[in-house]
Amino acid sequence: RRCYIDDHTTDIVKGVTTPLSNLYYSFIVLVCFYLIYRKHKNKELFYLGSIVVIYGIISIWNLGSFEMPISTWQPTTDNQSFILELSQSEFEQINIIYGEGDNNSLVGEYEYQLGVDGIIIEGSNDLSNWDNIVTLDEGPIYEYQSIKGCFNYKYIRINSSSKLNTITEIAFYNKDSIVGTKVYEDEHGGKYPASLVIDEQEMIEIDPIYYDEFFFDEVYHVRNAKEIADGQYMYANTHPLLGTNIIALFIKLFGFSPFVYRLPGVIFGVLIVIAIYYICKKLFDDIYLSCVGAILCTGDFMHLTTSRIGTLEPFSIFFIIMMYYFMVKYYKEDNYKKELINLLLSGIFMGFAISVKWNACYSAVGLAFILFRKLLEKKERVIKTLLWCLLFFVLNPILIYCLCYLPDKVWKDDVWSFKNVFEHNLMMFKYHHELNASHHFESR
């Protein structure tokens, strides 16, 4: 037969809203804030509110799908297989996506239930003669693999090479329509039956884009967040876990989908704009200059881009800005009690920032310059203030950092302790020190 393999040119706008809608909503927002301004004569509310809401609308536009396949098949032994039966034998495309399985089921083993590497997909029309269609490589987690061709098979056999393999969903397409599929044979069944690979067919995409799957470093951070949300033994050796726990909280509350795991970044991106406004106001004491700072922040491409991906940068940057905000407040304060409160809050946000990513340690150096400049200028209660700073900027961040590990199963057969947190951070340092790997999103 003639087989028409179409690249299915995909419209990047997938039904959430359109740029024209954004302009419409932004106009409504401006009108509403103008009416508030006319009534209350509050310039700050009008300017800042307009900037923040318009930026928020743009930031959340086409953020991600509200659903994606979740239930995952995993074998109980090596070299396990099952057979699917198709409603028609002709098809042109296979889409497959894998997620993480039940790591906790691997009793006593420091391994992870993860990946399609080595899985063989075969086709047959008589259940006796089998043709090899494809042998899958690992590929990134929660990113689709597509196999295109001209196929004619009634039965599909999936052969896993390792008990650590997983498949979340598989779908077969013919001329843009999905082919009906059912399980023909599944000898092992059990807790994770073969039916799990075809139970969410309405959620699988024929032409996936960023909107439908993991993108960039979401393969690390969102994977870890889902492990935390599901109470799974986790693979975490790249960064501290506060930011990951924030994403995990949203997944726990609202379910697992691209929109949900990217939403915390959008919220913190909006908070960054507000924080920039107020730190500018504290520095310049001018509403208009503060608005300029906030607008410049909204126009920064890195700020917008990283806020729309399930990464850690929005959390880290927000906490860094806040630790500087309270240090600037300390610098401009004359009341000693209020000075200490501002130093305490600066230290708390410093602890939060370092608990997201280690690069906040570099940012914290600037706090010391501001602190010592004021101490040298004022020359009052220097020793007493420095002693308080040992508590605020050393002990306090260490305690926050360690407590951020409490919700997480980093240790399979052990529990949280300061010793275990320390050893885990040594492992993270070793990972970054020895890392020499490529990345499929890297610049060339």
Predicted regions and their residues:
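Transmembrane-helix motifs of polytopic, lipid-linked glycan transferases
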Residues: 259, 263-284, 322-326
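Membrane-interface alpha helices of multi-pass inner-membrane proteins
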Residues: 294, 340-357
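Membrane-interface transmembrane helices that cradle and orient dolichyl/undecaprenyl
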Residues: 281-284, 323-343, 353, 375
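Aromatic, loop-rich ligand-recognition surfaces of beta-strand-rich domains
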Residues: 11, 58-132, 138-210
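Transmembrane-helix signature of polytopic, membrane-embedded enzymes
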Residues: 256, 276-299, 317-318, 334-341
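Short acidic/glycine- and proline-prone juxtamembrane loop motifs at membrane-interface regions
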Residues: 261, 301-315, 358-359
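Extracytoplasmic catalytic/substrate-binding loops of multi-pass membrane glycan-assembly enzymes
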Residues: 70, 187-204, 210-222, 234-246, ...
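Transmembrane-lumen/periplasm boundary regions of multi-pass, lipid-linked membrane glycan transferases
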Residues: 61-66, 177-196, 210, 214-226, ...
